[in-house]
UniProtKB/Swiss-Prot annotation:
Belongs to the ThiC family. One of its GO terms (molecular function) is carbon-carbon lyase activity. Catalyzes the synthesis of the hydroxymethylpyrimidine phosphate (HMP-P) moiety of thiamine from aminoimidazole ribotide (AIR) in a radical S-adenosyl-L-methionine (SAM)-dependent reaction. Substrate binds at N66, M95, Y124, H163, S185, R186, G187, D226, G227, M228, R229, E265, Y292. The lineage of its organism: Bacteria, Bacillati, Bacillota, Clostridia, Thermoanaerobacterales. Keywords: 4Fe-4S, Iron, Iron-sulfur, Lyase, Metal-binding, S-adenosyl-L-methionine, Thiamine biosynthesis, Zinc. This is Phosphomethylpyrimidine synthase. [4Fe-4S] cluster binds at C409, C412, C416. It comes from Desulforudis audaxviator (strain MP104C). The keyword Cell division does not apply. It catalyses: 5-amino-1-(5-phospho-beta-D-ribosyl)imidazole + S-adenosyl-L-methionine = 4-amino-2-methyl-5-(phosphooxymethyl)pyrimidine + CO + 5'-deoxyadenosine + formate + L-methionine + 3 H(+). One of its GO terms (biological process) is thiamine biosynthetic process. It is an enzyme of class 4 (lyase). Pathway: Cofactor biosynthesis; thiamine diphosphate biosynthesis. Its cofactor is [4Fe-4S] cluster. The gene is thiC.
């Protein structure tokens, strides 16, 4: 069932009920949000094993994990392990960004084994197939691009990243203004090369209605990609980025008119003092459409630690109203992430999202922290580990560093503040 069309008719779908249960909400606000386009439930009608996830206003901040093969590393076994680790770490959605090996097989395996929404970037496969077929990405034919879109929709992909805002107009803005890092979006660069070589408009923009027909038929949500996202602090919030956002705002209107669910992607690399303004600008220009941000990374000098730079920016962005955070791993800017990089990226991004949910008073967020505080007050280590966002790491640290199972920890030892104050105040440990 098409989620937005059902919501317009006042029909509550099983997916809406699932989202309401998971969020601790009555179903009516979810129904209203889907109808208005401020909540998106990516759920391809052909998916059989999907646990519906809601993204948008009033809901818990969601986290996406990117996985995928590359031309240098295309082993499916690694891919499967990374998927399992991302899910175990708590990812709410997964994107298959594969560019190496059998792309159809890789995607179909993920869809068959992944219970959460799965997204793709169709231009990747279209570009790679054009290179294999003709020897050059710029030789890609427009019909072949849309054939890939429909093939992936038929497979059950729940949302597409589509760089429809990379237009001849936005490229002209970029060329006139100049940029330090130009275009860092891979999908945006594929389309830019094709457009400039062929001197033609972006097919996704020119034939946007054709794209909407496919998405409507399978209820694939559109994630309007930010091909002009800044790739460094110096390029943040420049004319090219804002020009693309203006176009994306117009495309949001067209998606909603057609009954296609839509959310909007955002930067990128952004200084701390510009993040809130970027979120407010997107929400204003895109009429409350859910905002999906990559980071944003708040400095460019921390390769190896970009899961931290992204978590800092992600917390601020989500606090300001961003709804969906794409994880960044420690391997960002350095290479394909390992299994451990994937786990660390998901956990760091979940921490950022939860920190924002505390501010936004998302149901259950403050209660989680309060339960942890009570467990700490009671020196209840098992409960603390159970409540930790990463129980595995918490247990390992505690076991390794407190082998004698002292009531406190090895940081303070017998001078544990919780223990001492409890004794002086005559309080017993409280069970949480």
């Amino acid at each position: 069932m098409n989620q937005m069309l059902a919501a317009w008719q006042g029909t509550v779908t099983p997916e809406m009920e699932q989202v309401a249960r998971d969020e601790g909400y009555p179903v009516e606000p979810v129904l209203q949000g889907v109808a208005a386009g401020t909540i998106v439930i990516p759920a391809n009608m052909r998916r059989k094993n999907l646990k519906a996830v809601g993204i948008g206003t009033g809901l818990r901040t969601k986290v996406n994990a990117n996985i995928g093969t590359s031309p240098k590393q295309s082993a499916l076994d690694d891919h499967r392990v990374k998927l399992r680790v991302a899910l175990d770490a708590g990812a709410d959605a997964v994107m298959d960004l594969s560019t190496g090996g059998d792309l159809d097989r890789c995607r179909r395996e993920i869809l068959a084994s992944c219970p959460v929404p799965v997204g793709t970037v169709p231009i990747y496969q279209a570009a790679i197939e054009a290179k294999e077929r003709y020897g050059a990405i710029v030789a890609m034919r427009e019909d072949e691009l849309f054939e890939v879109v429909e093939r992936q929709a038929k497979d059950g992909v729940d949302f597409f990243t589509i760089h429809a805002g990379v237009t001849l107009e936005s490229l002209d803005r970029l060329r006139k203004q100049g940029r330090l890092t130009d275009i860092v979006s891979r999908g945006g660069s594929f389309l830019t090369g094709w457009m400039l070589h062929n001197d033609r408009e972006n097919p996704f923009y020119k034939e946007f209605d054709r794209l909407l027909e496919i998405c409507l038929a399978y209820d694939v949500a559109l994630s309007l990609g930010d091909g002009m996202r800044p790739g460094c602090q110096a390029d943040a919030t420049d004319r090219a980025q804002v020009q693309e956002l203006l176009i994306l705002g117009e495309l949001v209107d067209r998606c909603r008119e057609a009954g296609v669910q839509v959310f909007v992607e955002g930067p990128g690399h952004v200084p701390l003092d510009q993040i809130i303004m970027n979120v407010q600008l997107q929400k204003r220009l895109c009429k409350g459409a859910p905002f999906y941000v990559l980071g944003p990374l708040v400095t460019d000098v921390a390769p190896g630690y970009d899961h931290i730079t992204a978590a800092i920016g992600g917390a601020v962005a989500a606090m300001a109203g961003a709804d969906f955070l794409c994880y960044v791993t420690p391997a960002e800017h350095l290479g394909l992430p390992t299994v451990e990089d994937v786990r660390e990226g998901v956990i760091a991004t979940r921490i950022a999202g939860h920190a924002a949910d505390l501010v936004k008073r998302v149901p259950g967020a403050r209660e989680w922290d309060e339960r942890m505080s009570r467990a700490r007050k009671a020196l209840d280590w098992e409960k603390q580990i159970e409540l930790a966002i990463d129980p595995e790491k918490a247990r390992r640290y505690h076991t390794e560093r407190n082998p004698e199972k002292f009531a406190g920890c090895t940081m303070c030892g017998e001078f544990c503040a919780m223990k001492l104050v409890g004794e002086y105040l005559g309080k017993d440990y409280e069970n949480c």
